[in-house]
């Protein structure tokens, strides 16, 4: 996908929604929507809110797939049990949906879970992190680098 300046308004709507909710962190689906609207290809994805919906939508996305917890409290999802890789079939989707939500709640009991992101798994892909902030001296700053469990290693 090529960047189209007319998509700037769509990005601004997502950012305003995040800001209006009082969050400083975008949910996984929101951040990936911003990346996609910026002209960068992302794997097929959908945010689901029940195991039944997860089963139905997983068949549309295809396998293997990844599940990621969607919660503003999930900055490091992997460490909190909020990521499952390599899901191969519908039965596993149902089992893992229950497991990922209960494991995450076990790690962060007061967390509000907005849903679970189902995403097509890309074999041998590199995990990336993208972030942004407004620095008083430099203005808007974008951070881009290796993501996943390596984020803390290089911090």
Range-by-range predicted roles:
Residues 1-155:
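ATP-dependent carboxylate/acyl-activation modules
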């Amino acid at each position: 996908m090529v960047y189209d300046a007319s998509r700037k308004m769509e990005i601004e709507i997502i950012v305003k929604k995040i800001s209006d909710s009082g969050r400083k962190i975008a949910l996984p689906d929101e951040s990936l929507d911003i990346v996609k609207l910026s002209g960068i290809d992302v794997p097929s994805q959908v945010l689901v809110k029940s195991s039944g919906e997860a089963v139905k939508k997983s068949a549309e996305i295809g396998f293997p797939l990844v599940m990621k917890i969607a919660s503003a409290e999930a900055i490091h999802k992997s460490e909190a049990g909020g990521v499952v890789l390599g899901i191969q079939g519908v039965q596993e989707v149902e089992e893992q949906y229950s497991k990922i939500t209960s494991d995450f709640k076990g790690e962060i009991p007061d967390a509000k879970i907005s849903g679970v992101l189902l995403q097509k798994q890309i074999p041998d892909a590199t995990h990336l992190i993208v972030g942004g902030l407004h620095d008083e001296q430099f203005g808007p700053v974008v951070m881009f680098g290796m993501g996943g469990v390596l984020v803390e290693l290089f911090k």
